[in-house]
Amino acid sequence: ADDDCLPRGSKCLGENKQCCKGTTCMFYANRCVGV
């Protein structure tokens, strides 16, 4: 589902989900951030 994603600000490394649309995983910060 489209809502099964990581919202902005969540940890993203090692998670089973992708960052939500409009955000990306910042590797060094381990956070989903807006692009």
Curated annotation (Swiss-Prot):
Subcellular location: Secreted
Record GO cellular component, one term: extracellular region
A Pfam family per the record: Toxin_30
UniProt-listed InterPro entries: Assassin_bug_toxin-like
Gene Ontology molecular function, alphabetical: calcium channel inhibitor activity; toxin activity
Keywords annotated in UniProt: Calcium channel impairing toxin, Disulfide bond, Ion channel impairing toxin, Knottin, Neurotoxin, Secreted, Toxin, Voltage-gated calcium channel impairing toxin
Secretion signal span: none
Protein's UniProt keywords contain Secreted: yes
Disulfide bonds: C5-C20, C12-C25, C19-C32
Domain notes: The presence of a 'disulfide through disulfide knot' structurally defines this protein as a knottin.
Similarity-based family: Belongs to the venom Ptu1-like knottin family.
Biological function: Binds reversibly and blocks P/Q-type voltage-gated calcium channels (Cav).
Name recorded for this polypeptide: Toxin Ado1
Organism: Agriosphodrus dohrni (Japanese assassin-bug)
Taxonomic path: Eukaryota, Metazoa, Ecdysozoa, Arthropoda, Hexapoda
